[in-house]
Structure formats: C-alpha cells, structure tokens
Amino acid sequence: MKKVLVIAMAALFIMGMASCNGNNATSEETTEQAVSTDSIEIKDNLTMGREFLAENAKNDSVVQTESGLQYMVLKEGTGAKPGPTDTVTVHYTGKLLDGTVFDSSVERGEPASFPLDKVIPGWTEGLQLMSEGSHYRLFIPSELAYGSKGAGDKILPNATLIFDVQLIKVDKQK
C-alpha cells in the first residue's frame, strides 16, 4: 500500500513539474502575443488616423495645410496672431478619435500658457493660423503630434489627435 502511495505521489509530482514547465512556455507565448497585439494596435492607430483624415478632408469646412494638419474655424478672432516663439494663453480640449478626452484646460477651469516652440508641431503650426479671440478645431496627424512614441498611457503611439482651441492672448517674443 505504501509502495502504491509513493508511486502515485511521484506521478503527481512529475505531472505537476511538467505542467509548470508548460506554464513557462505559455507565459512566453502570452508575452509574444501581447507584443504582437501592441504592434497591431499601433499600426491600427496609424491606419485609423489616415482614414479619418482622408474622410475629414472631404468636409467643406475643413482646411488642410501642406504638412497634413487640418483645421476648422469655429470662430474667427480679430486680435494679434502669434509667431513661432511667442507665448500664447489658450483654453483647449484634447480628444482621441474615439472621443475620449485626454486633457482639457476647460475642465480644469484655468487657461494654459506656453511658448509655441515648446509644444507639438501641430500646435505650433495651427496656433499661428489663429488670431486672438479665435476658436479652431485642429485635426493633428500623428507625425505632427507624438508620433510613434505616444505620450503617457492615454495617447497611444501613432494617434491622430483632435483639439478644440480658443486663443485668448498672444505675448509677443521680444
């Protein structure tokens, strides 16, 4: 009886070890699948962004610049226009293509101020088109935003971004 018990325990031990070894392979496979899924998601972001911008360009109220930046004038202002190194004060809401808000000075209740040469290229270009008092919607392709790196955990690599921007004030660089 003891001999049968020892053999049964040895068999269970061997089966347990074999299943643990199999779990390591499964973990490796899971990691490879996650990396593969991330690559697909990154590629999909780029594809979805390009498809969105191509369709968006058909809208009569959307203007596309040579760089690929698109914008829509919601309200035209009459004040000063910023240069590439001027500091601007704005209210803005940034969204992903699915409508998820990732940042908003409007929600914080306080406008943001920054030099235009310290932001993403889509902002530097887009805000120079605006006059104080303007309200534009900017459609920024990933290469004019955060590109293949993304930003934080909300803006994935290759994400096209949409910003509603109100230009409140321009402080000219001296």
Per-segment meaning from a language model:
Residues 2-174:
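Cross-family detector of peptidyl-prolyl cis-trans isomerase
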